[in-house]
Design a protein with these regions (language model features):
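An N-cap/entry alpha-helix motif that binds or orients negatively charged groups
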Residues: 2-80, 331
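Generic structural signal for well-ordered, non-membrane alpha-helical segments
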Residues: 37-41, 45, 101, 105, ...
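N-terminal functional module of multi-domain proteins
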Residues: 44-130
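Alpha/beta enzyme core
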Residues: 109-110, 139, 151-266, 273-297, ...
Length: 338
């Protein structure tokens, strides 16, 4: 199975919200929520995609021919590629009821672990979303990253107990989910967190903690102050606020400010191995891709996930070879033209 075949099969299994576009660029679903779209007109998701395409790679084949090494070491784990599947919760509501969170997470987490990467998993209003996610990670020997919504600190502590029971090697919180409509009137109050609250959450996790939803240098430095091991430069896939800059536009300045003191992930509109290369050149340590993994699972299950990982991985390796680098460490700023 290749990814194109996977997309064709997914069209018959997904609901009305996701259009299963050949190129997932945010245009067809831009204002649909529930679904993969945004609460506004969706221009941030579209900008995310477009800005990666504005960056060009610097081809250089006057180099010694060497084996290409795409491997990444992160938090004591070794991965075949520097990209991860992104967190998605309540899949039956957003993408169609041929799968639920239990079946989706079982396929995604186990397949990612089998084929050399790891999956971030989602959270939701239904507490069973997080339960299903952490159970899938436990079955995979802890090779997954459970991602909690920014609930109140007491509720997050309860969810961190699930993380510990799963043996997850890291945990995350998508702080930008504060902009999701269903969190606005949640009781007890959920949403944005102070540095002090974040520090308490980081301590409760007991494993390397990743703060997802950082779009400014100021935000990155506050996450560092709170003790985060990593950040994700992210605007929640453009879902939570229109008129934001693209992640590609802010990544480099954030990476320069962090200066290696935390690991940096980036997401938002990354749709090829060449995009992954660009992100690493601008200072990211790794990349997160979400929506295309959903269609991979719906369209092909385990084989679909394998096909998508191989697609992105082979594109990355080819770009590295054509740009004269043989390891991730060699992908530097001069490899791209912005």
């Amino acid at each position: 199975m290749n990814y194109a075949e996977c997309l064709e099969l997914a069209r018959g299994k997904m609901g009305n919200y996701c259009k299963v576009c050949p190129e997932c660029n945010g245009r067809a679903c831009k204002n649909q929520m529930p679904g993969p779209g945004a609460k506004g007109i969706g221009d941030t998701a579209i900008r995310n995609y477009d800005k990666w395409k504005d960056i060009r790679v610097q081809m250089d084949t006057l180099v010694e021919k060497r084996p290409i090494d795409t491997s990444l070491s992160l938090f004591g784990k070794n991965f075949q590629y520097p990209f991860f599947a992104g967190p998605v919760g309540a899949v039956n509501m957003h993408y169609g009821d041929s799968l639920n969170d239990v079946s989706y997470n079982d396929i995604l987490v186990s397949s990612c672990a089998e084929f050399g990467i790891a999956a971030f998993t989602g959270d939701g209003m239904d507490s069973n979303v997080m339960v299903a996610a952490t159970e899938a990670i436990k079955k995979a020997g802890g090779l997954g990253i459970p991602t909690v919504k920014p609930w109140n600190v007491a509720m997050i502590r309860e969810k961190m107990a699930l993380v510990k029971d799963a043996g997850a090697f890291a945990a995350a919180m998508d702080i930008d989910a504060a902009g999701l409509p269903f969190l606005k009137n949640f009781n007890p109050p959920a949403g944005s967190k102070s540095v002090e609250e974040l520090r308490e959450i980081v301590k409760a996790a007991g494993v390397p903690f990743i703060v997802k939803g950082i779009m400014t240098v100021k935000g990155a430095l506050k996450a560092k102050e709170a003790g985060a091991a990593a950040i994700v430069v992210s605007n929640h896939g453009g879902r939570v606020l229109d008129q934001c800059p693209a992640t590609a536009e802010v990544l480099e300045e954030i990476a320069e400010a962090v200066d290696g003191s935390m690991k940096i992930f980036v997401d938002g509109g990354i749709r090829s191995g060449t995009d992954v290369f660009k992100a690493l050149a601008l200072g990211a340590d790794a990349v997160i891709i979400a929506r295309p993994f959903v269609t991979a699972v719906y369209g092909g299950g385990r084989e679909g996930v394998e096909a998508y990982i191989q697609k992105i991985g082979s594109e990355l390796a080819d770009t590295m070879a054509m740009c004269g680098v043989s390891s991730l460490a060699e992908i530097t700023r001069d490899c791209v033209r912005v």
